[in-house]
Amino acid sequence: MRPQWFDTAQPAKGASPIADLPTDGVAVLVGDATRGLQWIVTVDDSNGHLMVMLNVLRGDQYLSGSGFDGSKYFAGTVLQEWRGRTDDLPWFVMARTAAAVTRVVATTDLGTDVELTLSPFMSEFGSRFAAAGIPEGECPCAIRAERDGVIIDTSPQPVWTCPPAPFGLGF
């Protein structure tokens, strides 16, 4: 399956191609990764904040999920991002961006640029959403947001070394 986005948010529970996820919210982005994995980005704004989750599945089996919670409004940035992994799964990156962003790219420890699948602007959340799996054996070290080829925001490598230990970080 090619990565896809939804022009409108889709229910996260019981809607094809989305398996029943242990999360509330709506699906905004879906894509495939290595080893038969599928990722689904869901968004929930029912608590007055915006909870953005990346869920990983293999077929109908839910494997893992994690994400971030924050204000519905951007404060001094156009990029909010998350990167993580668990156990034997590859790294994943996910971002929430302002409408002006036209491209999101993660650069790995080996110098590979991975372009994230980017949703259209979703007015109900005031954001665009992006996600991608990172190639096997590589780790996301920097993430940048671009507008028409010009970098407008970056999120450098966190304080941990790249690649960090697989346990205790991410999912």
Question: What label would you give each PLM region?
Answer:
Residues T86-W91, A98-F171:
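Ser/Thr-rich low-complexity repeats and stalk/linker segments
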